[in-house]
Amino acid sequence: MIIEGPVIKFGDKIDTDIIIPARYLKYTDPQYLAQHVMEPLDPEFYKKASKGVIIVAGKVFGMGSSREQAAIALKAAGVKAVVAESFARIFYRNAINNGLPVITLPNSTKEIDENSYVKIDVETGEILVGNKVLKGKGITEMALEILQAGGIMEYLKKMQTVNRN
């Protein structure tokens, strides 16, 4: 699975309340949530992301409360993948389960500049930035299957169909 796009960069400790503020959690429409993603840091993020972007961030991206809407809002806004030095474990699982690729890359914010154009091999974790190849951590075969299906629900529907035949 290859994903490519321009980079928007954030720092360390981007928590789920920054990704999607709590006041929007009562809404379930992904497109509505997308309009408010990253609002506390960049009120214009939704417009920038709508063209399809890769977020590059530092340590513990997605920390804080378990908020599935964070991954849903990012994906709906046009975020194709998140590359970070580390992820909060629950955000990592929520992202995969909602079809949003996440790649761990040591020193991510030092290795990749804002507005760079990157090409990511999600399976191997390799990231091409210009003529430089960075080695991130790939994902498991199961996680790749879930991503390729579009998320856990689509994966389960697919498996149910396969098992019926």
UniProtKB/Swiss-Prot annotation:
Catalytically driven reaction(s): (2R,3S)-3-isopropylmalate = (2S)-2-isopropylmalate
Record GO biological process: L-leucine biosynthetic process
Protein name as catalogued: 3-isopropylmalate dehydratase small subunit
A Pfam match: Aconitase_C
The entry's keywords: Amino-acid biosynthesis, Branched-chain amino acid biosynthesis, Leucine biosynthesis, Lyase
NCBIfam families: LEUD_arch
Organism ancestry: Archaea, Thermoproteota, Thermoprotei, Sulfolobales, Sulfolobaceae
Subunit record text: Heterodimer of LeuC and LeuD.
Gene: leuD
Family annotation (InterPro entries): Aconitase/3IPM_dehydase_swvl, AconitaseA/IPMdHydase_ssu_swvl, IPMI_Swivel, LeuD, LeuD_type2/HacB/DmdB
